[in-house]
Amino acid sequence: DGCFESHATQPRATLIDRCTGGFMRFRQGGDYNQMPNHLADLTLWNFNAKNNVADSPFIWWDNNSLWWKFLPPIVVGYHGGSIHFDESQMKLNEEQGNTVTPYSLYEAQLRKRLGAVPAWLNSLQ
């Protein structure tokens, strides 16, 4: 199963919006001199996990590893599989186990900015 990848020095602000897939540790990359894997603006919104990490609790910043470093993320509507997050390492963990509305944060932001979701985007659904 695939999962999101976050390679060191590159990710600064990422919205993973209503995606379905795996959620596994150590699928990230980057030289240890270029950590963290992600800076402060990682948001997972309505993530439907099909393959969860067995680690409990799931940590975002591993002091015992050179290669697993995420600044505290925002996670809203994580569902599909059972996982226990270390909430002390998160900005926000809301509605875990449930889908939330708006279903797509990206589309809701477009609606607010543009007044509507563009037709080309609606045609992809």
Predicted regions and their residues:
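Extracellular parallel beta-helix/beta-solenoid repeat domains
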Residues: 1-125
